Curated annotation (Swiss-Prot):
It comes from Campylobacter jejuni subsp. jejuni serotype O:6 (strain 81116 / NCTC 11828). This is 1-deoxy-D-xylulose-5-phosphate synthase. It comes from the Bacteria. Pathway: Metabolic intermediate biosynthesis; 1-deoxy-D-xylulose 5-phosphate biosynthesis; 1-deoxy-D-xylulose 5-phosphate from D-glyceraldehyde 3-phosphate and pyruvate: step 1/1. Catalyzes the acyloin condensation reaction between C atoms 2 and 3 of pyruvate and glyceraldehyde 3-phosphate to yield 1-deoxy-D-xylulose-5-phosphate (DXP).
Amino acid sequence: MSKKFAHTQEELEKLSLKELENLAASMREKIIQVVSKNGGHLSSNLGAVELSIAMHLVFDAKKDPFIFDVSHQSYTHKLLSGKEEIFDTLRQINGLSGYTKPSEGDYFVAGHSSTSISLAVGACKAIALKGEKRIPVALIGDGALSAGMAYEALNELGDSKFACVILLNDNEMSISKPIGAISKYLSQAMATQFYQSFKKRIAKMLDILPDSATYMAKRFEESFKLITPGLLFEELGLEYIGPIDGHNLGEIISALKQAKAMQKPCVIHAQTIKGKGYALAEGKHAKWHGVGAFDIDSGESVKKSDAKKSATEIFSKNLLDLASKYENIVGVTAAMPSGTGLDKLIEKYPNRFWDVAIAEQHAVTSMAAMAKEGFKPFIAIYSTFLQRAYDQVIHDCAIMNLNVVFAMDRAGIVGEDGETHQGVFDLSFLAPLPNFTLLAPRDEQMMQNIMEYAYLHQGPIAFRYPRGSFILDKEFNPCEIKLGKAQWLVKNNSEIAFLGYGQGVAKAWQVLRALQEMNNNANLIDLIFAKPLDEELLCELAKKSKIWFIFSENVKIGGIESLINNFLQKYDLHVKVVSFEYEDKFIEHGKTSEVEKNLEKDVNSLLTKVLKFYH
């Protein structure tokens, strides 16, 4: 087995500093090479290479819990842990996950932000109860510190005597947001008479050196800013080391050894460069955070030239049009401005649209208050991340019956990011909520109509749309959106009906076209609304079609099948329902087309299943 990258703690300890630096350089080359082909999180991993090497050198990865927040910076850890032979399969079907997974030998699963410190605290408690001497090490980015959960954990950790190391990877991705509001409080500690007097003396001294005064003044201000995070952690009762150079292996190793020897909760503040080692990525955080395949030399994305507009781009343009038309429209995103397309609205209307960092709970409740004040909030959020604010959705929006719009991006299978990111639960957790209206567009024109309707609608409303492009284009004429009204797209006397929801309509249409080529037919309904259902249309359909196939990109439990069965029971209608929604299991990573084939949700597999009902 090749051991170019895989090293035990003992092996790393025997390497010289120069050899460790060469190892880091080789790992960067490997990461760039693989991500350029498979896509993935590039810049965050390039910025954490030395941190990961130092963790493996100072601590024992076989016994000490290594916890990677979000874990989108864990590629070096994977290489060091013996995954180099399968690293080329990163994010591929049946290959290595882009995140940490226990099934691959990691301590804990990760994919969502700000869980690492809580996990470290829990691990500390378990270790203490077992009487063991292990030390949890949590690597967390500064962006993740914008979420309240991280501070909840720090609050408890600071009041403990646990041996625990928090390695803060400060790559300035969003340090101004997690630290910004708190630094206003902390800056009061420096706004004393002594500090102000001292600052004036330094300023007078700099006047004597006119050529370097500007530079020195800037460095002076920066040096005081560096104190801010240290004060925060120390006031919480944590030991603090830093800031250190997160790319200087000697500094990092020394700091980790110092923290290890303390046998107390300690924060090491390491400053890093996101995208380190790949010039095109350095300093361009958003572009190179999560990427598809790209050409290493030019940095250009490798994608089809005939690519259609994405659903996100369509959403962004439509919301821009609506915002220019209706001045009471406001909006928010939680650290995903470019991912949700809200960046363009923040740029054009900075007083009406906000990025509140990784703070989904705050995002939802703050918009609820704006709705209470007469504004019309659009919350642009990935389906998977709305899970993080479920209580706020219920408590602050549904119970209040407020006019809040939830635009749920990345609904359905999202592909290579895998089980932590699949958007297949939103229908199940939103449908039970009183006052909520749920719908989904099948194509671009229906997206426009639905967004216009959502603005006019009274009460909380949510619509979902896929990652990437809509499959359908202009195959069907759009209809006016009316509350709880479906659209009958293909109408005939067949005893079989296809009921599609959102992107599921496209899949149903693809199967139907194949059937028609075999001289078979079926009714095709675009439900448009999951809640409320079009009971009038469905009652009419039940008179002629006795076999209904459900096409929807949600799990079966709590999905369209559940809603349809409730409707049939309500009216004592006898129809056989066959659902092609997802089974009761988490969906692994891989290209969407390959994942669907594995799940037998591709068109050919669905066609085979449907044909069994034709005689």
